[in-house]
């Protein structure tokens, strides 16, 4: 949260300010939101927020934080599988680069929706 508080202090100096912030993780987003709210900024009416980690804190803060859920279990499973394959097929040369994409999930909540645009999904 401390990094979010520092980022919010910098954001308050900006003119014009951004319409939205996509934070590196939920704690940073929450730190920014709390700091900006203390400064009188209305979230999401003035600045919308999205976090990245789908922490339990996303549901505790007001407004509830929109957040991207990462498929952490699947990441671990794929990483372990790749590591075991490398161990089984060990050689002195490094194999070709491999890129793997996993599907995250955007959980839309109040922090990213202006009151006049909110609807129940």
Give each language-model segment a name.
Residues 9, 13-120:
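Flexible loop/turn connectors
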Residues 1:
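Conserved active-site histidine-acidic residue motif and adjacent donor-binding/catalytic loop
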């Amino acid at each position: 949260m401390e990094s979010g508080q520092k980022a919010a202090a910098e954001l308050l100096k900006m003119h014009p300010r951004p319409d939205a912030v996509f934070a590196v993780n939920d704690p940073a987003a929450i730190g920014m939101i709390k700091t900006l709210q203390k400064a009188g900024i209305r979230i999401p009416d003035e600045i919308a927020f999205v976090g990245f980690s789908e922490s339990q804190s996303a549901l505790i803060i007001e407004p509830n934080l929109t957040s991207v859920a990462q498929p952490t279990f699947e990441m671990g499973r794929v990483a372990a599988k790749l590591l075991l394959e490398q161990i089984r097929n060990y050689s002195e040369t490094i194999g070709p680069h491999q890129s793997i994409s996993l599907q995250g999930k955007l959980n839309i909540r109040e922090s990213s929706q202006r009151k006049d645009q909110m609807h129940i999904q």
